[in-house]
């Protein structure tokens, strides 16, 4: 479920040495499954362990995960990175905002997962997003742009060279193309 690098494990052992006996760490997600999901790590003293917590053993400490956060921490990783600017813990949880879908889930669910977990984070840098409206019987993903993408002069390039290319690579033989059904209106909200 959660991978903690050797460097991060050593860092946690050092931090926990200054805490009361029996203190471990807690890895959690606030607002899991939403666009505002945030992950965190905190100390977990013995009296803060809940009956439904999942417990994972590491070198010199355990990591507690609450039942609600667990599915959103699938494939999560924690590392301790040192560079010229110093050192920091990094926590990556690719499924925090949306639960990973099974490989045999309906095509629309798998496309929506890729949109939410991979494409929308890229578009967010311009204040934009896309939403899957439907997948036609012919295998065309019908998309609607929102935020800064609505009315952006580069939307056609983003759609064909970015989104369509990415989705066709992910779903060969299932998806035949993408189509934008947004009624674009250029305004102050538009990126370009």
Swiss-Prot record:
Cofactor note: Binds 1 [4Fe-4S] cluster per subunit. The cluster is presumably bound at the interface of two monomers.
Cofactor entry: [4Fe-4S] cluster
SUPFAM superfamilies hit by this protein: Fe-S cluster assembly (FSCA) domain-like, HesB-like domain
Protein biosynthesis found in the keyword field: no
Binding site for [4Fe-4S] cluster: 149, 152
The keyword 4Fe-4S appears for this protein: yes
Biological role stated in the UniProt entry: Involved in iron-sulfur cluster biogenesis. Binds a 4Fe-4S cluster, can transfer this cluster to apoproteins, and thereby intervenes in the maturation of Fe/S proteins. Could also act as a scaffold/chaperone for damaged Fe/S proteins.
Listed GO biological process terms: iron-sulfur cluster assembly; protein maturation
Protein's name according to its UniProt entry: Fe/S biogenesis protein NfuA
Keywords annotated in UniProt: 4Fe-4S, Iron, Iron-sulfur, Metal-binding
InterPro entries recorded: Fe/S_biogenesis_protein_NfuA (IPR017726), FeS_biogenesis (IPR000361), FSCA_dom_sf (IPR034904), HesB-like_dom_sf (IPR035903), NIF_FeS_clus_asmbl_NifU_C (IPR001075)
Source taxon at top rank: Bacteria
Assembly, per entry: Homodimer.
GO molecular function, one term: 4 iron, 4 sulfur cluster binding
Family to which the UniProt record says this protein belongs: Belongs to the NfuA family.
């Amino acid at each position: 479920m959660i991978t903690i690098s050797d460097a991060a494990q050593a860092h946690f052992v050092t931090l926990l040495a200054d805490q009361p006996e029996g203190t471990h760490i807690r890895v959690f997600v606030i607002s899991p499954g939403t666009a505002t999901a945030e992950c965190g790590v905190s100390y977990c003293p013995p009296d803060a362990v809940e009956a439904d917590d999942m417990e994972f053993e590491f070198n010199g400490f355990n990591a507690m995960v609450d039942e609600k956060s667990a599915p959103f921490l699938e494939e999560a990783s924690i590392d301790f990175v040192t560079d010229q600017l110093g050192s920091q813990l990094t926590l990556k949880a690719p499924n925090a905002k949306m639960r990973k879908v099974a490989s045999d889930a309906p095509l629309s669910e798998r496309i929506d997962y890729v949109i939410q977990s991979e494409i929308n984070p890229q578009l967010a840098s311009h204040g934009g997003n896309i939403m899957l409206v439907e997948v036609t019987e012919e295998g065309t993903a019908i998309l609607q742009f929102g935020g800064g993408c609505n009315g952006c002069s580069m939307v056609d390039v983003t759609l064909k060279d970015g989104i369509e290319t990415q989705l066709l690579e992910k779903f060969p033989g299932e998806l035949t193309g993408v189509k934008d059904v947004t009624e674009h209106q250029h305004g102050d909200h538009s990126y370009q």
